[in-house]
Structure formats: structure tokens, C-alpha cells
């Protein structure tokens, strides 16, 4: 090993040591274990007041805290929830597949009992502020003329019943 390689490796180990000490500090408890640049930018923005912290209450009553920029849309929040839940699942149980298409077609987010359905809506425009609580709520997507979609099984049985009469 050349002396230049040794210096780089020594510096890398020293940096890892300093970073682990910093991340162990209780003040930085909200920093993820392996933060991305966007995580750091959001946390800095939170300190400056240009981001907000939200509590997302899941159907089982547990909650998770997320930080989003003040200009974030509902779509941004959904992506952040997906990322956070996937990270938590990975840390707790290894990889477990969650069908987010299924989740968002059967549930929606709500704030103050108001269903949040427009993915392009800016969170602040729909009344979400710093420290707001957002909850999952059962939701059936409507199809066409204002009628709720029906499960295919029921349609099948109904058509069988009509032909036997």
C-alpha cells in the first residue's frame, strides 16, 4: 500500500468515527442513519422554518413523523410516506413488499376529517401546517358517473343470478 492510499484510508476512518459520534448526539436524533442529500436539505429547511414536520397516523394507530418542504404537494407527501415506511420495514423485518398502488386505491390521507384527493394540491393550501396530523382513511375510488366501483365477484354473482331466474 502506498503512503497516499494510507492517508486516504486513515482520513476515511477518522471521518466515519467523527460522523458516528455526531449522529449519536441526542440533538441530531432526527437525522436518519444514512442520510441522503435531500434528507439533510429538508432537516436544514425545517430548522430555518421553510419546511414543516407532520405526524402521519396509520390505521393501526401508530404514527410516523415526516418532514416536508412548505411548498410540497400531496404527491410529495405520499412519496415520502412510501420511502419512510419502506425504510422502517427494511430495518425491522427485512424486505417486505407493500403494494402502494393497492394502498392508494383503497385509502386516502385526510387532515381535520377532510379527504385529501388531489395529488397536485399544495399541502399548505389544503390546511396542513407545521405539526399537523395526517391520517389514513378508507376510500373507494369512484368510476364514471358518480357510482362507486364494485368488486368483480359481486358483479359475477349478480349476472349468474339474473340468468337462473
UniProtKB/Swiss-Prot annotation:
> Which Pfam families is this protein grouped with?
Ubiquitin_4
Subcellular location per UniProt equals: Nucleus
Q: Which residues form the Ubiquitin-like domain?
A: 52-137
> Which one GO biological process term can you cite for this protein?
mRNA splicing, via spliceosome
Query: What Gene Ontology cellular-component terms does the record carry?
Result: spliceosomal complex
Keywords from UniProt, A to Z, are: mRNA processing, mRNA splicing, Nucleus, Ribonucleoprotein, Spliceosome
What's the chief localization of this chain? nucleus
Q: Which Gene3D superfamilies match?
A: Phosphatidylinositol 3-kinase Catalytic Subunit, Chain A, domain 1
InterPro entries assigned = SNRNP25, SNRNP25_ubiquitin, Ubiquitin-like_domsf
Q: Where is this region: Disordered?
A: 145-165
Q: Which PANTHER family match?
A: U11/U12 SMALL NUCLEAR RIBONUCLEOPROTEIN 25 KDA PROTEIN, U11_U12 SMALL NUCLEAR RIBONUCLEOPROTEIN 25 KDA PROTEIN
Q: How does it assemble?
A: Component of the U11/U12 snRNPs that are part of the U12-type spliceosome.
Q: In its UniProt entry, what is this protein called?
A: U11/U12 small nuclear ribonucleoprotein 25 kDa protein
Tell me what organism the protein belongs to: Arabidopsis thaliana
